[in-house]
């Protein structure tokens, strides 16, 4: 998942979901440390590998495909807060309503992209680790990855639950975005 999951918390109105986001954030920290542990055991100088990740155009492009919608939501949320549009909401201001709806559209797209990340992209990247484990190679790393996959499956269930609740009308303003097709969520 995304380590910045906590940035969605101010836009969460359910204490149960906020607690869930806190646990999710903790899991992501553990995942990050687990990946670091694996890298330190595979490479004699893992710093070289870590440094090249941020310079590899293919990796950066793949990451931006997933995180683009998320970044747009976070940036818009900050702008919404700083512009004080939220203070106008109670007055029924036309502009504040448009801003709020646009923010919710971006939140929907961000959650849909995280859903795709958790449900598809991570499992594709785990395939090699699982194969090594089946061949009795790097079994410790394969076990770590299987625990991470278990957590990612929980994150998938969370995002699917959020999307399904929106689709069912949990938030009338958000339900209108649930007709978007998966490929449209990356805009």
Question: What is the meaning of each model-derived region?
Answer:
Residues 1-6, 179-185:
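Short, small-residue-biased leader/transition segments that mark boundaries at the very start
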Residues 4-10, 26-33, 107-132, 154-158:
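Alpha-helical bundle segments that constitute or directly flank the non-heme di-iron/ferroxidase center
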Residues 7-87:
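Long, hydrophobic, well-ordered secondary-structure blocks that form the structural core
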Residues 8-19, 41-49, 101-104, 127-147, ...:
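Inter-helical turn/loop segments and adjacent helix faces that build the functional surface
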Residues 21, 111-115, 145:
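Short alpha-helical scaffolding segments that buttress acidic/His motifs in well-ordered protein cores
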Residues 50-132:
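Eukaryotic endomembrane system proteins
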